[in-house]
Amino acid sequence: MEDIVARFETYAELCRAVQRKAIELENHPERKKRLRRFAAAEVAEILGISPGYLRSLVHEPDFPSGAIGPGGRRSFALSEIHAARAWLFAHTGNPRYAPRRRPEAGEKLQVVTFVNFKGGSGKTTTAVHFAQYLALRGYRVLLVDLDPQASATALFGLDPESEVRDATFASWLDRSRDARALVRPTHWDGLDLVPASIALQHAEYDLVGRLLERRDFPFYAQLAELLAELEAAYDVVVCDCRPDVGMLTLNALWAATGLVVPVPPSMLDFASSGEFFRFLAEVARDFRGSIARDALAFDFVRIVTTRFKASDRNQAEIVRWKRALFRDAVLAEAMVDTALVDAAGILKETLYEYEPAGNRRTYERGLEAVRRVDRALERELLRVWGRPVEA
């Protein structure tokens, strides 16, 4: 009889090998993830200035000049974009060039939790794109991967088995690691990661065991305590949850200031989301009755339509129903279902990282759809901080 344990271990290693090879091929010869450079037109859009103004600024003292590539095209690293934004603020005083939160003005750390009952909702894709968008915009971002499948972690080029192991949120539960020791820098300047691995599955059991041993154990507040140790270093924390309602998800809900629920436009997902919101109501009722009267008092809750095909009339009808029922809780913008996301995913990349070999116009349309969703979510942060919100 074949050893089923050995078979599954072999399958797991084959999957990891494919991930490693994809990263190595795309990033040869470094064999680790690196971020592409950004064209001058992209940089102008990111900074909110005209391309002509950017061309004039590169000749100013201390302004990042970027690098000249084939055809005389100028490009910039993300760190140079951050430096350009700082230069603009120093020379204009315009607060739009100083996006970091201002604790002295009462701007608290925003913890945005992406969560849903159901796998396949596009949750991780939406969460990681949002985290990268915020980094492009100049915020200090921490992405916390709470899913033992570690899909978000893999997108940043880490092998959960060999490079992460137990250095996850799970290690915080017994305080065997300092909070800062769990944070990994990524190839995105301004974006750090608390990675995931299968060790998080054991964290679920650990939290249940501690609660059985001590009924007053604050099992729900462990992530909030971790983030309290790291708060001064970040403006926004993005949490990618596992697709269930276990102990880790409860921690992410307790720590959250904002909630994003990705929902594909299908009746099955619509029904599943109804059960999810019923669960949230029960959790809020229990927490408020036994722990704190203001538990789960989110600054915002938004439903994001994911995997949307505008040409599909059935999907369009479901989206209309959602907006009629949930009104402003549903973002007007949607994460479109595009083959480009799959193409980028093969290389363990997002659309912000991807450099298409084919139709550039198709890529730009897909990227702009993602940007619209991310801008809409950024506006929620600005509202909470009491800042002006651009349309």
Question: What residue spans do the PLM features occupy?
Answer:
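P-loop NTP-binding core
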Residues: M1-E42, I46, P51-G52, S56-A391
